[in-house]
């Protein structure tokens, strides 16, 4: 019998030696009003680095090899270049579109997210270098398939959200008025986005394989 497969991928970056004090509350300070602030919880603050207790016993992080990093960057940059050159119908050429680069500190924070073993955004993953780190999440289920194929499909699924978006959504970085999902696409092709990182977790819980996939970009 062929086991079903479930995959989630997490994108984020870090240069390993960690340089940020993740418990510095100023990293996650959000202004509510002139004199009103909220301090969000940082995913890296006091994190043990271990999988959550709710994870299946066989849950494990797949190594983010150089080959895998390059694949993620290649797919993203090709899709971003398509927009930059004005080859995506309904979207003008981009005045600037930086080539995405990898950052290991963000990848580390992405890894902490997937170690929750659930499809859920964390409240904050900012660093000293990246004050506005966004996050894309995805997962997939199905029959066994090569990791590279899964990664490509998930990234392209984010990009496919362009069918519900217009250039104005990108310029103002706003939600769709009718609630359609476009946020992954707008994060991917923002000209302010120049850094990306990833993490992949896989497990077989309840007769399923599960790979959480999350993406963190500087926005």
From Swiss-Prot:
Family to which the UniProt record says this protein belongs: Belongs to the CRISP family.
Tissue: Expressed in salivary glands.
Pfam families attached to this UniProt entry: CAP (PF00188)
Record domain SCP: where: 73-211
Keywords, in A-Z order: Allergen, Disulfide bond, Secreted, Signal
Signal peptide: 1-19
Keyword Nuclease: no
Protein name: Antigen 5 like allergen Cul n 1
Highest classification ranks of the organism: Eukaryota, Metazoa, Ecdysozoa, Arthropoda, Hexapoda
Localization terms from the record: Secreted
Transmembrane residue ranges: none
Gene3D superfamilies per record: CAP
Keyword field contains Disulfide bond: yes
């Amino acid at each position: 019998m062929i086991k079903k497969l479930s995959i989630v991928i997490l994108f984020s970056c870090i240069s390993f030696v960690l340089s940020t004090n993740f418990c510095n509350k100023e990293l996650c300070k959000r202004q509510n009003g002139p004199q009103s602030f909220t301090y969000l919880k940082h995913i890296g603050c006091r994190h043990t680095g271990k999988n959550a207790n709710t994870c299946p016993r066989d849950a494990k992080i797949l190594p983010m090899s150089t080959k895998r990093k390059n694949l993620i960057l290649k797919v993203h940059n090709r899709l971003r270049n398509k927009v930059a050159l004005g080859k995506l119908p309904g979207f003008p050429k981009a005045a600037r579109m930086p080539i995405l680069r990898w950052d290991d500190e963000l990848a580390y924070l992405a890894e902490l997210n997937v170690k929750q073993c659930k499809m859920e955004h964390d409240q904050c993953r900012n660093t000293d270098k990246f004050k506005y780190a966004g996050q894309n999440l995805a997962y997939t289920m199905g029959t066994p398939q090569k990791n590279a194929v899964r990664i490509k499909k998930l990234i392209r699924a984010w990009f496919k959200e362009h069918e519900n978006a217009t250039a104005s959504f990108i310029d103002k970085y706003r939600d769709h008025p009718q609630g359609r999902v476009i946020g992954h696409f707008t994060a991917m092709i923002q000209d302010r986005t120049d850094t990306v990182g990833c993490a992949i977790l896989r497990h077989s819980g309840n007769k399923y394989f599960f790979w959480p996939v999350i993406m963190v970009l500087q926005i």
